Amino acid sequence: MDGVSQRVDQRPNRIAVLSVHTSPLAQPGTGDAGGMNVYVLRTAVELAQRGIEVEIFTRATASHIPPVQEAAPGVLVRNVVAGPFEGLDKQDLPTQLCPFTAEVLRQEARQLPGYYDLVHSHYWLSGQVGWLTRDRWRVPLVHTAHTLAAVKNAALAEGDAPEPVSREIGEKQIIAEADRMVANTAEEARQLVELYGADRDRIDVVPPGADLTRYRPGDRAAARAELGLAPGEPIVAFVGRIQPLKAPDVLVRAAAELLRRDPGRALRVLIVGGPSGSGLQRPDALIELAAELGISERVTFLPPQPPERLVQVYRAADLVAVPSYSESFGLVAIEAQASGTPVLAADVGGLSTAVRDGATGLLVRGHETADWADALGALLGDRDRLRRMGLRAVAHAAGFSWAHTAEGLLESYSAALWEFHGARAGVGAGRMTPNQARSRALWRRRMGVRR
């Protein structure tokens, strides 16, 4: 069998997925739950449907949560007790990586040898755990960063706290150690290479997706009626965690500027999400900002919505705004477009991939209030243009499905398995990090394998 055939045939039977700081079962849009939660759960479900057992390890955050939950057929969530259930900020979680890792290793030790074929870690905290489990279990590590400290710190919102140096150091360690890196976009792959010295040959670009069976166009009037919104009022919606990084204040300020220019204009700003992060993190702060700007009666706040209600938010809106200072991709943009709603987004990170500028929405450079007000007014003032954009948005979003993401992950897993075990067996050159070299040397000694 040649090398290509061997690589194609390499496929995991069971994988360990690490999501230390947030559970895939948590409600997106509040706390530390967001797009990554959706990503972890949806890809796990798709992989399970392809015959791969998925076990997700996450930190337990409440005493009533059972140790193991079945998220879907073939998908288990293992809730690991590491530190107090409540009151532990994400910035404090590095102190709990040791007990978390210990419990993950203990759970694997109760199984037969070779229980997991591969580890996939999400976010840098999980990567630190993944690096150790990879060496202990002698299986490849695939890592997805989701966000990068160096990128976030280069585009901080006013008043936002920078990511600590310790995180950037941790990210560099993981990137050096991972067998494969999964980047959401080509832009993220470039950032990994240029900012972190990643090996481009070990990066796989696999775009996230959306649940296209759920997020699809529907009756706007019915959606507005369900949400208690006026039938004829232009609506621009923001969906996400209320934190400086996501910049909901940029939308509120732009709306206020638009109304200052034209006080008689009809406009509704719909904010859907809950508190997170630091600085501008409470809905109350955004409510106070709207009051200061004199547009309180034009802004409606809703808590985070489950998927069956969230699709109605997208359908109800004429436009969805994603004004983030940094985004590795932007799932909200794809979900909105799949629902037939154009997107007004910041021209940052993966949003230039998620949104086709001028076709399915508009990208705004920078976060100046006047620029956002101009773009907002231009789109809301041209109903025909919005309608055409909405049609193109659906077609564009059709290229982003979780099924497609899962297939991309399987290709990355296949490459990781082939390189990892091929290096052991002498098939191909393989690519080994220092820790891999040490662990594989130990494996050779134990198994009596000679070079």
UniProtKB/Swiss-Prot annotation:
GO terms for biological process: mycothiol biosynthetic process. 1D-myo-inositol 3-phosphate binds at H21, D32, A33, G34, G35, M36, N37, K90, Y123, T147, R167. The lineage of its organism: Bacteria, Bacillati, Actinomycetota, Actinomycetes, Mycobacteriales. Belongs to the glycosyltransferase group 1 family. MshA subfamily. GO terms for molecular function: acetylglucosaminyltransferase activity; D-inositol-3-phosphate glycosyltransferase activity; magnesium ion binding. It comes from the Bacteria. This is D-inositol 3-phosphate glycosyltransferase. Mg(2+) binds at Y314, R315, A317, T341. The keyword Magnesium applies. Its EC number is 2.4.1.250. Keywords: Glycosyltransferase, Magnesium, Metal-binding, Transferase. Catalyzes the transfer of a N-acetyl-glucosamine moiety to 1D-myo-inositol 3-phosphate to produce 1D-myo-inositol 2-acetamido-2-deoxy-glucopyranoside 3-phosphate in the mycothiol biosynthesis pathway. It catalyses: 1D-myo-inositol 3-phosphate + UDP-N-acetyl-alpha-D-glucosamine = 1D-myo-inositol 2-acetamido-2-deoxy-alpha-D-glucopyranoside 3-phosphate + UDP + H(+). UDP-N-acetyl-alpha-D-glucosamine binds at Q27, P28, G35, R241, K246, Q305, E327, E335. Homodimer.
